[in-house]
Structures are given as structure tokens and as C-alpha cells.
Regions:
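Nucleic acid-binding interface residues in structured DNA/RNA-binding domains
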Residues: 1-104
């Protein structure tokens, strides 16, 4: 039987380059409201970059966390990774968030 985290990773693998999703969308895709559980799974992701956890952002379109951090060099790294995939970011927010949001 697959764990909650493994199921979350399976969904995240479906998010293509240049798109993002949210903790909330992944939880919805799993049929739950365990948004924080999704966040914990992403924090512990042992399969990066195959499971592209840098593509998970907050529901507001802001960066959220990355590698267990919410500021500093980890967020700078997340922004660089997303920009390299063509995601437009201003400050710590995605410019065209609703257009590139991947829903399950």
C-alpha cells in the first residue's frame, strides 16, 4: 500500500515544466484537506528533482516553502529553478499564477 507522501509525489510528477501547483491542489487530488501533510511530504521529498517539489507554491501564488525553509537561499534557489522553466516571478509571487496553475 502506498503512503500518503508517495501518492502526493505521484501527483506532483504530473506537473509539467513551466507550470506550478499548490499544496491545496495536491491535497484535493488526493481527496483530502491535509494541505500541511502535503507540505511535510514535499519537505521530506527524497526523489528530487524527479519529483519536482520546487513547482509547489502557496495558494496565493507566493513561493511558500522550499527544502523546509520559507526565506533565504532556499527560496532564492526555488525562484531560480522556476524562472529557468519559464515561470514569470515578481518578488516572491508568480505573475500569471492562475494561467499556469496545474489542477488535478
Amino acid at each position: 500500500m502506498r503512503t500518503f507522501a508517495e501518492k502526493a509525489y505521484d501527483l506532483l510528477r504530473k506537473v509539467p515544466e513551466g507550470r506550478v501547483t499548490t499544496y491545496k491542489e495536491i491535497a484535493r487530488g488526493l481527496g483530502t484537506k491535509a494541505y500541511r501533510g502535503v507540505g511535510q511530504a514535499m519537505k521530506r521529498n527524497p526523489y528530487a528533482p524527479e519529483v519536482p517539489w520546487h513547482r509547489v507554491v502557496a495558494s496565493s501564488g507566493r513561493m511558500g516553502g522550499f527544502q523546509g525553509k520559507t526565506s533565504g537561499s532556499s527560496i532564492v534557489k526555488k525562484i531560480k529553478m522556476l524562472k529557468a522553466e519559464g515561470v514569470e516571478i515578481s518578488g516572491d509571487k508568480i505573475k500569471n499564477f492562475e494561467e499556469i496553475l496545474f489542477r488535478f
